[in-house]
């Protein structure tokens, strides 16, 4: 018997709690609000100057004229800063009760106890809970919310801040630079390998809320780390904005994997800038899952600056009714013998739209560089659409570039075979979809793979007929 298609109100993470914030800025973006954010955070003068300069860039830069439809995004209707509690806690018991109940519903304390080396939980504009295992601290690993790192690790913080993504990069990077709050700061010392993942969880609770976390990760020579972030928000009738910036520096021989499982509600604009600089023989892997949001525009980038540097992006995007996933990757080869891989898996259903948008650049010094791109799309019905928009720029003849794109529908032969074995059409379709995304889920830690499969199954309910 076919399952009932879930109503939007049944979205598991769509609950919202009463407002328990201790401060909320006026709606709209002004110099006074930026100054107020900086004053409340007791920031050094250089950070206030950085914010105000970024605000000027934001005002002066045009909106993107490509990608998704941003016409319904009204910057004057957004609340840019909501402070949910007095401070970030290291004991779960000390987190304010209403906020703790939200994260309890999302399974955060349980996840930490089971398999995480460290956890950070951000609610609205601030990190409300942060903890890391003591043995990692003893190795010199720094894992803090970004605001604390600015105060406690200012020298290394300032050395790398906004060096990978300056405020002039794009309008939303400028916006983030002006009003950023929260996020994660990670430093892994030379030769130290973090064996279990560090996680951050980002939650929007308020209506018309903007969340602008800023994450900075520095992986020193021959060090390694795996960082995982998850995102959810309540279902509202008005729009919210998530506009993060993620900067990563991977030094000689270092390794970083950054895993995202984004499950924002369908009223959230998810407009994110993520970029890594990889030095000699460094490796960066983006594992990027996009299930929710009204519109996602996200293209994780690797600047392969050192000889032998490697970059990989493995992404999945699922778009249903009223959704547009405009996602992809950028690989910038600047040195000899660099290599990159892009694997993009997209599913569109019930009139959803998926777009792969990618750039691969081979600079003049990229002798012997190589890149492989695979784009696979599964279209579930005649109402849904898919576009593939690759852009390749080649300034060196001695390179290798392979690009394969494939668009398919659920095969009648596959369905017939499975249904002839007593499997319902809905279950058969679900099995085909699970097989399609398996290259992505097998790269996730086990607990995340289970959750990802559950999310996909939930999204696929009601897709038949």
From Swiss-Prot:
InterPro entries named among the record's database cross-references: Fe-S_cluster_assembly_SufBD (IPR055346), SUF_FeS_clus_asmbl_SufB (IPR010231), SUF_FeS_clus_asmbl_SufBD_core (IPR000825), SUF_FeS_clus_asmbl_SufBD_sf (IPR037284), SufBD_N (IPR045595)
One GO process term, biological-process aspect: iron-sulfur cluster assembly
Disulphide bridges: none
SUPFAM superfamilies: Stabilizer of iron transporter SufD (SSF101960)
Top-level taxon of the source organism: Bacteria
Residue ranges that the Swiss-Prot or TrEMBL entry lists as coiled coil: none
Family indicated by similarity: Belongs to the iron-sulfur cluster assembly SufBD family.
Assembly mode: Part of the SufBCD complex that contains SufB, SufC and SufD.
Protein role: The SufBCD complex acts synergistically with SufE to stimulate the cysteine desulfurase activity of SufS. The SufBCD complex contributes to the assembly or repair of oxygen-labile iron-sulfur clusters under oxidative stress. May facilitate iron uptake from extracellular iron chelators under iron limitation.
Protein name: Iron-sulfur cluster assembly protein SufB
Organism: Bacillus subtilis (strain 168)
């Amino acid at each position: 018997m076919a399952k009932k298609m879930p109503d939007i109100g049944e979205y598991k993470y769509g609950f919202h709690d009463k407002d328990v914030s201790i401060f909320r800025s006026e709606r709209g973006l002004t110099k006074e609000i930026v100054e107020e954010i900086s004053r409340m955070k007791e920031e050094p003068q250089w950070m206030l100057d950085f914010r105000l300069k970024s605000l000027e860039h934001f005002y002066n830069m045009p909106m993107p004229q490509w990608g998704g439809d941003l016409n319904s995004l009204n910057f004057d209707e957004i609340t840019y800063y909501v402070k949910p509690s007095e401070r970030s806690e290291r004991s779960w018991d000390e987190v304010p009760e209403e906020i703790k109940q939200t994260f309890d519903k999302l399974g955060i304390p349980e996840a930490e106890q089971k398999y995480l080396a460290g956890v950070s939980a951000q609610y609205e504009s601030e990190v409300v809970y942060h903890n890391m295992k003591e043995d990692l601290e003893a190795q010199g690993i720094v894992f803090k919310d970004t605001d604390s790192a600015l105060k406690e690790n200012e020298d290394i913080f300032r050395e790398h801040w906004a060096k990978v993504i300056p405020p002039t990069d794009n309008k939303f990077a400028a916006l983030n630079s002006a009003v950023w709050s929260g996020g994660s700061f990670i430093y892994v010392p030379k030769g130290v390998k973090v064996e279990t993942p560090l996680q951050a969880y980002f939650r929007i609770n308020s209506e018309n809320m903007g969340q602008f976390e800023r994450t900075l990760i520095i992986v020193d020579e021959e060090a390694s780390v795996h960082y995982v972030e998850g995102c959810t928000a309540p279902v509202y009738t008005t729009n919210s904005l998530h506009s993060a910036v993620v900067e990563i520096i991977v030094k000689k021989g270092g390794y970083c994997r950054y895993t995202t499982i984004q499950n924002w509600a369908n009223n959230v604009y998810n407009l994110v800038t993520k970029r890594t600089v990889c030095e000699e023989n460094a490796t960066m892997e983006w594992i990027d899952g996009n299930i929710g949001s009204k519109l996602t525009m996200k293209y994780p980038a690797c600047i392969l600056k050192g000889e032998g540097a490697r970059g990989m992006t493995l992404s999945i995007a699922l778009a249903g009714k009223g959704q547009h996933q405009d996602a992809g990757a950028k690989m910038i080869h600047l040195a000899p013998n660099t290599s990159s891989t892009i694997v993009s898996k997209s599913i569109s259903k019930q009139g959803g739209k998926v777009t792969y948008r990618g750039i691969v650049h081979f600079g003049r010094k990229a002798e012997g560089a190589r890149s492989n791109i695979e784009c696979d799309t599964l279209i579930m019905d005649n109402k849904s659409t898919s576009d593939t928009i690759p852009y390749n720029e080649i300034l060196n003849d001695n390179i290798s570039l392979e690009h394969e794109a494939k668009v398919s529908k659920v095969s009648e032969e596959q369905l017939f075979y499975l249904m002839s074995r007593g499997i319902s059409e809905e279950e058969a379709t679900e099995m085909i979809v699970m097989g399609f995304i398996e290259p992505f889920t097998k790269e996730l830690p086990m607990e995340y793979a289970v959750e990802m499969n559950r999310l996909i199954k939930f999204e696929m309910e009601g897709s038949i007929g």
